[in-house]
């Protein structure tokens, strides 16, 4: 009989990617430890028989307590750590509030570092895999999303370095380059771009309606279940041709979600090419009218 394999996933609130991945791994026979800041938001997982734990990735004490709790279940061997917890931030780059940027970085980047550091020994013992849920915006300069883009770009650079450094210990690192997915992240305070994100003294104020009208086409995004179904085989060693011969090998990057294929191609193109495409998508004027608000 095959030994139990344990998966720890952050950011598992219902309606999100983490929740769908938790259910997928559970259905495939893994022992899943699902976490979120509010346990009641994982009621569907609890009813499905999954173990749920309260975790705030921005809190060192919370991370430490969960590591100790998880150790009781895993006996010190964690096979997958999926860092999915994320925070959005939508606003013009030039108008960003440092406090908002700090909050996004604390979850999307520093939170991942905290988790990997805390669980390193459990992962090494199991020869496990770290999965950092990233986004194609780490390559693609999606307009009016600069803080989120920057947090994911930092995460990608960190992940690529971590992959090299942990290889001698038998721990693999994979980045899921996420395209458009229908999640509840857009409903969070900083996730939905509203007119409030463009103050009257902003240089974009005259174009606020145009900007809001041309945000991402959520209706075209894949569902969280479709995303989980696409990512899972590659995470467990069955989705790439070379995994037929080396099933233990995990890809450095997995691309899944709406426009992820275009993002993959775009990552190999000059930045100028993709920047031009994004400008056309958001319909920014080639020349903007500027009014100096510093002058009465």
Swiss-Prot record:
| Name of the protein in question | NADPH-dependent 1-acyldihydroxyacetone phosphate reductase
Instruction: List the catalytic activities from the record.
Output: 1-hexadecanoyl-sn-glycero-3-phosphate + NADP(+) = 1-hexadecanoylglycerone 3-phosphate + NADPH + H(+); a 1-acylglycerone 3-phosphate + NADPH + H(+) = a 1-acyl-sn-glycero-3-phosphate + NADP(+); a triacylglycerol + H2O = a diacylglycerol + a fatty acid + H(+)
Please report which protein family the annotation says this sequence is part of.
Belongs to the short-chain dehydrogenases/reductases (SDR) family.
Q: What is its EC number?
A: 1.1.1.101, 3.1.1.3
Keywords of the record, alphabetical order, are: Cytoplasm, Endoplasmic reticulum, Golgi apparatus, Hydrolase, Lipid degradation, Lipid droplet, Lipid metabolism, Membrane, Mitochondrion, Mitochondrion outer membrane, NADP, Oxidoreductase, Vacuole
Xref: InterPro entries: NAD(P)-bd_dom_sf, Sc_DH/Rdtase_CS, SDR_fam
Where does it localize? Lipid droplet; Cytoplasm; Vacuole; Endoplasmic reticulum
Underlying gene: ayr1
> What role is this protein assigned?
Can convert acyl and alkyl dihydroxyacetone-phosphate (DHAP) into glycerolipids and ether lipids, respectively. Required for the biosynthesis of phosphatidic acid via the DHAP pathway, where it reduces 1-acyl DHAP to lysophosphatidic acid (LPA). Also has triacylglycerol (TAG) lipase activity. Involved in the mobilization of the non-polar storage lipids triacylglycerols (TAGs) from lipid particles by hydrolysis of TAGs. Lipolysis of TAG by AYR1 is essential for starvation-induced autophagy. Forms an NADPH-regulated cation-selective channel in the mitochondrial outer membrane.
Q: Establish whether keyword Metal-binding is in the entry.
A: no
* GO cellular component terms, A-Z: cytoplasm; endoplasmic reticulum; fungal-type vacuole membrane; Golgi apparatus; lipid droplet; mitochondrial outer membrane; mitochondrion
The catalytic residues are 148, 152
